[in-house]
Amino acid sequence: MNRSLLYPRATTTRRLIGLDGMWRFSFDPESKGVEAGWALDLPSSLSMPVPASFCDLFTDKASREYCGDFWYETSFFVPAEWSGWDIVLRFGSVTHRARVFVNGVEVAQHEGGFLPFDATVTNIVRYNQFNKLSVLANNELSETMLPAGTTRTLADGRKIAAPYFDFYNYAGIHRPVWLMALPKERVLDYSTRYRLTETGAEIDYTVSTNGPHPVTVELYDGTTRVAESSGTTGTLVVKNAKLWNIHAAYLYDLVIRIHEGSAVVDEYLDRIGIRTFEIRHGRFLLNVSPVYLRGFGRHEDADIRGRGLDLPTVKRDFELMKWIGANCFRTSHYPYAEEIYQMADEEGFLIIDEVPAVGFMQSTANFLAANQGNGRQQGFFEKETTPALLKNHKAALTDMIDRDKNHPSVIAWSLLNEPQCTSAGTEEYFKPLFELARRLDPQKRPRTYTVLMTSLPDTSKGQRFADFVSLNRYYGWYVLGGAGLADAEAAFHHEMDGWAKVLHGRPLIFTEYGTDNLSGAHKLPSVMWSAEYQNEYLEMTHAVFDHYDFVQGELVWNFADFQTTEGILRVDGNKKGIFTRQRQPKDAAYLFRKRWTTLPIDFKKRKK
């Protein structure tokens, strides 16, 4: 099997053609397309951009809220000179599931809307001709998938998604599509692990191929080769190594080759950063130096294109994070596009990488019910659907780690977001996931999950598995919000005193906290939803953080306003953004800029 999640690269032995652009598109509410032959001829004149979500491109509500099967179609040309190579189609993501057809022949199926998959079509394509590519996608939700939810049928017969999570269920081909010509024998994967030495650094590597020929690995600093080795496992010794660091990213070029005599059978290139990351004595250590995490939970979300990859938006987001003094973000609540990790590698940002395990609390208003204990069912991990859910969870976790393990920016894995974890089935569900993450990652990054409001130090059955504890807390908003901030602060301290007793030397970070603020809403004296209240809440919350030495990071919710399912508690989406959805600063952005640009990088490096 030639499964590979390596990012597509053009090299001396590999060829790429991007298939992004305007495709044809059709809804298939009756799921009749396969039998009707739509894989060969899509009966639609609709055009649709790829990558993008389809939802916000329409002006009618039925199209925006469509739930069910839908089709994409395009054509691609295979040059005659590609004959003799493996021809592979590669999708960055299709949300949430896909069946892929080439010239009417089904070549792939994939479940999960946030990670890549490919299909070898060598024996299907016609050379020196155009070939038809069709994708049957589906965006229905269920309790066996990540993220979790359900699908219900309206009185008029239309399906509608009912997510258990608080972000909009955008759908479509969200990331780039590539046509690749690859050598028959090729590099399938590689992994690295770093050690710092008195004279530089050592890089232990492993390379996976699908053939018998020898492998060489070289490391370049610009045009200068600084280390080399041979074999599918080995060590690169780098003298006077330049380390990758926060806002001072230094990247080397890694060159992996397969040789047959004097000929190069395959060549794969990537960029890596030499750095170590660990937890020691309750501190996060980057290159053996303490680092206090500051930044955001985010979403892949923007006007019009929805969750589709948009590089100008990505660029703007990183510029704003640099301006405000952030050094870290969580990929809430799913793995992001690979291009975002590449930019984090280049800009020197830290990433907590999160698998799309969200909505594991049965509620159609998860953001409120989960935090107030009103979920309709507490035992989410004791259901008939649990075995299938766990299987899909393991598959997504495996793909995420395989895809992202070589990024220097990735410092930790988040295995779940706000699961219901106070019932008996929690430990049986959590244990194999945390063990799998440890086994798969050659760098043994720390593992965590985000703890919702109703999971307290003495009730959470999952926190013992985490290498560091990540809390989502909203004292002063969902809990004791309004004029009684003093009560919120007292309750917050009471809970934190409880966590101090169960951490056992582990650090704790906040992966969510915040209030909604309608941009431009001012009120004196303050009221909830105003800029003044948001700032008062943040000042109170930060004072609590600063009181506890074991708090080692703060990732506010959210970087920018984002779209959600409509409802009486959401004013055209979630307004907790420090920036607007159009990426302009709210008043709170200046509060964070003052705080984060003055806090030392090793804030709280010594125990009190």
Describe the function of each predicted region:
Residues M1-M343, E347-I351, A396, I411-A412, ...:
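Secreted/periplasmic carbohydrate-active enzymes, especially glycoside hydrolases
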Residues D204-T206, F318-L320, C328-R595, K604-K605:
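Substrate-binding/catalytic cleft of secreted carbohydrate-active enzymes
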